[in-house]
Amino acid sequence: MSTSSSDPFFNFAKSSFRSAAAQKASASSLPPLPGPDKKVPGMDIKYDVVIVGSGPIGCTYARELVGAGYKVAMFDIGEIDSGLKIGAHKKNTVEYQKNIDKFVNVIQGQLMSVSVPVNTLVVDTLSPTSWQASTFFVRNGSNPEQDPLRNLSGQAVTRVVGGMSTHWTCATPRFDREQRPLLVKDDADADDAEWDRLYTKAESYFQTGTDQFKESIRHNLVLNKLAEEYKGQRDFQQIPLAATRRSPTFVEWSSANTVFDLQNRPNTDAPEERFNLFPAVACERVVRNALNSEIESLHIHDLISGDRFEIKADVYVLTAGAVHNTQLLVNSGFGQLGRPNPTNPPELLPSLGSYITEQSLVFCQTVMSTELIDSVKSDMTIRGTPGELTYSVTYTPGASTNKHPDWWNEKVKNHMMQHQEDPLPIPFEDPEPQVTTLFQPSHPWHTQIHRDAFSYGAVQQSIDSRLIVDWRFFGRTEPKEENKLWFSDKITDAYNMPQPTFDFRFPAGRTSKEAEDMMTDMCVMSAKIGGFLPGSLPQFMEPGLVLHLGGTHRMGFDEKEDNCCVNTDSRVFGFKNLFLGGCGNIPTAYGANPTLTAMSLAIKSCEYIKQNFTPSPFTSEAQ
């Protein structure tokens, strides 16, 4: 928004109107919500760029385009609930970093299931005077069109400003050649170079590193043991993490806010930038022109006031996630509304919602072995009994016979002396393990050997969590046309949009075999660290629980030949000014976390926008 008094946005900023969400929010400098019935007389509400969605991908577009001088509006269906830093990671509190299991409840509270088959359980013990249904209920996300045998039952979305980045694991590995989509045809070296350039920039936005846990005893216990057991066969390292260690006991986890500060602009820190965030606003459809060559406007709905508005822009970017991008497009006349009909394919984006992928997931938890725990104090000289005056723990710094570095031994010595009541030699605030062996052709799955909070996997209070190691292995899924995400022409979701429905099964053949091999690999590897935790034996988890849904609006070079929706600049085929961002663009079978790859594609998309669209003039008169 301009700071010039001659700019109509300046006058509008001085008006008293705010969206209902903005009126009740405690965050400062929330924006006005433009609309034809609320605007200052004579003003024309138009942005250079509108972005739907405020997660890391939307924030990548915002960072690139706001910094390049574009006037940008961002709309999100969720509200601001992450504290002073809008869109920040909710794990960035001392409370959760001291007890990671408490964060499980935060994640569970944020996730909303996408498609839930109707519960056919009949309650036949109601009082005869109570109203009783003759059919099954359809509220709370229940979807009578969902086949429970072909569902992604664990698939869920997060509707808050910042999206899933407010509670994600921050794992940001790069895809290797086998997982990546091509950006450069017929030149593998040039494609490698292009991906390296984009990945490097994306990693800088996320502050990705591989050494935040280098002085964790538990991390090194697991890492060194696995490296020893698989010497010459597999490589182990820290999981690449979007995070910054602020102190030995506190990590700042990256989020959408790390990529782009979601405060409105201009402000004192960015006096020459133009950006507005509109929370609690549902984007319902984009309006196509008569030639189906560009988008003319975006229809939005203030979820608190109930008002509806039409927003105009030069460029429209949808980054609302793999499900909601597709939902918005279908509601706008792209793809096909209703159950797919192979004999009557849609004219616009016939591959929309087809060839979807989701990773298989195996999970278990182990309790570290006696051998590993005893090795923690192997350099200590222990005299006496804990609790007695004669008790002492010492070591010889720098001794060539030491098995551990001095920082390790100093922590162990101090803990054993200061907490003689504790049977474990591991300090209470020792950081968790964050280990991986990356996806490779001989073992085509991604691994996370760590201790973190998910919507599952909390540890009971009777087990000390310092002993626990979580094992999560993620398998790739081949894209198949029959695996689909489609949207009902009869039923709506809680936001009055077409109800999403899955038609999905893990394909037979390579996908299924690799999933079974992955399970075997996890069982063998985890047994080298310790025994299984009762209740967390090796198991396949619900389809969709990974929350890495991909391929819903696939990327490719040719719409028909590649069965895709967007080109390698993330621009929708046939449309000059409509762009899609997120994991829905990724058309390949991948096992690793896809966020960094989706961000890299967004950076490339922004480069195209900057080359082909000119920002509106900006004046710098004093406000």
Swiss-Prot record:
<comment type="function">
    <text>Catalyzes the oxidation of various aldopyranoses and disaccharides on carbon-2 to the corresponding 2-keto sugars concomitant with the reduction of O(2) to H(2)O(2). Plays an important role in lignin degradation of wood rot fungi by supplying the essential cosubstrate H(2)O(2) for the ligninolytic peroxidases, lignin peroxidase and manganese-dependent peroxidase.</text>
</comment>
<dbReference type="Pfam" id="PF05199">
    <property type="entry name" value="GMC_oxred_C"/>
</dbReference>
<dbReference type="GO" id="GO:0050233">
    <property type="term" value="F:pyranose oxidase activity"/>
</dbReference>
<feature type="modified residue" description="Tele-8alpha-FAD histidine">
    <location>
        <position position="167"/>
    </location>
</feature>
<keyword id="KW-0732">Signal</keyword>
<dbReference type="GO" id="GO:0042597">
    <property type="term" value="C:periplasmic space"/>
</dbReference>
<comment type="similarity">
    <text>Belongs to the GMC oxidoreductase family.</text>
</comment>
<feature type="binding site">
    <location>
        <position position="450"/>
    </location>
    <ligand>
        <name>substrate</name>
    </ligand>
</feature>
<dbReference type="GO" id="GO:0050660">
    <property type="term" value="F:flavin adenine dinucleotide binding"/>
</dbReference>
<dbReference type="InterPro" id="IPR007867">
    <property type="entry name" value="GMC_OxRtase_C"/>
</dbReference>
<keyword id="KW-0285">Flavoprotein</keyword>
<comment type="subunit">
    <text>Homotetramer.</text>
</comment>
<keyword id="KW-0274">FAD</keyword>
<keyword id="KW-0560">Oxidoreductase</keyword>
<feature type="signal peptide">
    <location>
        <begin position="1"/>
        <end position="28"/>
    </location>
</feature>
<dbReference type="InterPro" id="IPR036188">
    <property type="entry name" value="FAD/NAD-bd_sf"/>
</dbReference>
<dbReference type="InterPro" id="IPR051473">
    <property type="entry name" value="P2Ox-like"/>
</dbReference>
<feature type="active site" description="Proton acceptor">
    <location>
        <position position="548"/>
    </location>
</feature>
<dbReference type="InterPro" id="IPR012814">
    <property type="entry name" value="P2OX"/>
</dbReference>
<protein>
    <recommendedName>
        <fullName>Pyranose 2-oxidase</fullName>
        <ecNumber>1.1.3.10</ecNumber>
    </recommendedName>
</protein>
<feature type="binding site">
    <location>
        <position position="448"/>
    </location>
    <ligand>
        <name>substrate</name>
    </ligand>
</feature>
<keyword id="KW-0574">Periplasm</keyword>
<feature type="active site">
    <location>
        <position position="593"/>
    </location>
</feature>
<feature type="propeptide">
    <location>
        <begin position="29"/>
        <end position="38"/>
    </location>
</feature>
